[in-house]
Amino acid sequence: MTRTSVLADALNAINNAEKTGKRQVLIRPSSKVIIKFLQVMQKHGYIGEFEYIDDHRSGKIVVQLNGRLNKCGVISPRFNVKISDVEKWTANLLPARQFGYVILTTSAGIMDHEEAHRKHVSGKILGFVY
């Protein structure tokens, strides 16, 4: 089976481990995009600590789960989103207002939709977490 998206596989592994009640999950291979996505999730308290393990190949990440995550997913293809259109995407992807985050990749880095609105930057939509 070929991998279509490393980020989608990583978020799928996190979702499955969270549903089965595991305390930690191993993600491999790793990438910079996965690490930045996990940093946004950690900043909002959806996951605990995570550790990058360099195995001189593609690397591994061990993520500590805290049971707060309901769902996280990837949006494929990565649609271009204007600042004015972010509100429409949050309404479509998230279950309620003020609940969860849409994660964007912008010229200023990977961030959630609220931070992108504050910094007044737009970009491509990566995924969501709630």
From Swiss-Prot:
Alphabetized SUPFAM superfamilies for the sequence: Ribosomal protein S8
Covalent S-S links between cysteines: none
Pfam families linked: Ribosomal_S8 (PF00410)
The keyword Metal-binding is annotated on this UniProt entry: no
GO biological process: translation
GO MF annotations, alphabetized: structural constituent of ribosome
InterPro entries given in the database record: Ribosomal_uS8 (IPR000630), Ribosomal_uS8_CS (IPR047863), Ribosomal_uS8_sf (IPR035987)
Signal peptide annotation: none
Protein name according to UniProt: Small ribosomal subunit protein uS8
Species annotation: Kluyveromyces marxianus
